[in-house]
Design a protein with these regions (language model features):
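Ser/Thr-glycine-rich phosphate-binding loops at phosphate-binding pockets of nucleotides
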Residues: 9-12, 75, 99-100, 207
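Gly/Ser/Thr-rich phosphate-binding loop
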Residues: 1-24, 37, 121
Length: 235
């Protein structure tokens, strides 16, 4: 069954970009619809304007002034427009990581690439104001054990044991290296840690819509991040 991507927001009263059966490119959201213009701001944010963009936010003129500038709606999404006009979404602006070296890194693409591994459940890329990019990885007990069995290896009884398993570590490393092939060296994951637990709603690491709560995860694993991943330099 053919599946085609599109893009829209509440603020655009429906879709602003669509992929057509006769004109599409895998990995993109297609081209702007008739009457819609799209552009990429200096910070990488996708902006759109046209008759579909709402007039503003009811009773919130301050938000309207911030989000809609000279008719351009700032979507909050990071994106690219290729030479043929096809648009790709690369992440969320609020999730953007800026390393200590000033490199802007969109974590979403890296995270998605790492999570293609059959053993990985979740991945959180970190590195804001840090010297390099790193990742926190969680495992799926059932899927990881199924993969171990397919490799002729012994299954593990819990996530903590899985996290210490050298075969699993090698598989996660493979996934990280593969993810790094799609980005520059400055954007690549230099270190990763496999966690002995998962991000869940119960432990406050996921929202009700199952999105990762980045700030909470970083705060919870602060000691690991500051003493293991980013080892302080000896004075």
């Amino acid at each position: 069954m053919p599946l085609l991507e599109g893009y829209g927001m509440t603020e655009t009263c429906g879709p602003v970009c669509v992929s057509l059966p006769e004109n599409n490119r895998i990995g993109t959201i297609g081209m702007p619809m008739s009457g819609v213009t799209a552009g990429i701001a200096d910070d990488g944010e996708l902006c759109v304007r046209g008759h579909l963009v709402c007039r503003g936010y009811h009773n919130h003129p301050d938000v309207t002034a911030e989000q809609i500038v000279d008719g351009w709606l700032h979507t909050g999404d990071l994106g690219d427009i290729d030479e043929d006009g096809f648009i790709s979404i690369t992440g969320r602006k609020k999730d953007l990581i800026i390393t200590a070296g000033g490199k802007n890194v969109s974590p979403g693409l890296l995270e998605a690439a790492v999570m293609t591994s059959p053993v990985v459940n979740q991945c959180l890329v970190i590195g804001d104001r840090k010297p390099f990019v790193a990742a926190l990885v969680t495992l799926d007990l059932a899927d990881a054990n199924a993969w171990l069995k397919s490799q002729g290896a012994q299954e593990e009884s819990d996530l903590a044991s899985l996290a210490r398993n050298p075969i699993v570590h090698t598989e996660v490393e493979r996934a990280v290296n593969q993810a790094n092939e799609g980005v520059s060296r400055a954007e690549s994951i230099r270190k990763f840690e496999i966690l002995p637990d998962e991000f869940t709603q119960d432990n406050g690491m996921l929202t009700a819509s199952l999105k990762t709560r980045r700030a909470q995860i970083v705060a919870h694993h602060r000691e690991l991040i500051d003493t293991v991943i980013y080892v302080p330099k000896k004075k």
